A protein has these predicted regions:
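Family-specific signature for flavin-dependent thymidylate synthase
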Residues: 1-200
Length: 200
């Protein structure tokens, strides 16, 4: 199961956002102005604030995270790191296979004849790794709808829900406007919600 810890955030983010937004009009912006800016899609103002999380997730989700732009990553090394846990899918054959691959990898790390960088090729995508991720508010604002979507993997959706909950608790003036674009989504064949895309 993924875990998330908020370790750093811009101090007094609304003050920063109002100051930045006010530059356009040469006067201090209000919460109402921030709301208007977000609703109009003028999200560049959100780039002046950031949030940093410590995350534990599978290699599979780590790879998905790196597809999102304007996030910065520092990851646990894959060279010589012993594996102790993995994301359990609930599918017996899959989970047993991942556990077996982890054992092979750990044994390879203890084998002096196998270079650690070569042993790393055996790491299963289900293995859990730790990383620190930093993104500005715009990056998180654009990340969340994509990974809160029911089409996202179960693990990544759970991770996104945790991140969203923490951001919403700290800055509801911004993150209450995160919405899922189900009615306008162009993905085809969604089995959860009728979208504008071609249906299967």
């Amino acid at each position: 199961m993924p875990s998330v810890k908020l370790i750093s955030m811009t101090q007094d983010p609304m003050e920063v956002l109002k100051t930045a937004a006010g530059m356009c009009y040469q006067k201090k912006a209000t919460d109402k102005v921030i709301k208007h800016i977000i609703e109009c899609g003028h999200l560049s103002v959100l780039e002046h604030c950031y949030a940093t999380f410590e995350i534990t997730c599978s290699v599979a989700v780590l790879l998905q995270l790196t597809r999102h732009r304007h996030l910065s990553f520092t990851c646990q090394s894959t060279r010589g790191s012993r594996l102790t846990s993995y994301y359990e899918t609930g599918v017996h054959d899959v989970d047993c296979s991942v556990a077996e691959q982890m054992d092979f990898y750990n044994e390879a790390c203890d084998n002096p004849d196998i270079p650690l960088e070569d042993a790393a090729y055996q790491i299963p995508k289900g293995a859990e790794y730790k990383l620190v991720v930093t993104g500005n508010f715009r990056a998180w604002f654009e990340y969340l709808p994509k990974r809160l979507c029911k089409r996202a993997s179960k693990e990544h959706r759970l991770l996104a829900q945790m991140i969203y909950g923490m951001l919403y608790a700290k800055v509801p003036e911004v993150f209450s406007y995160v919405t899922l674009p189900c009615e306008t989504c162009k993905e085809s064949g969604c089995s959860f919600v009728k979208t504008k895309g071609k249906q299967e």
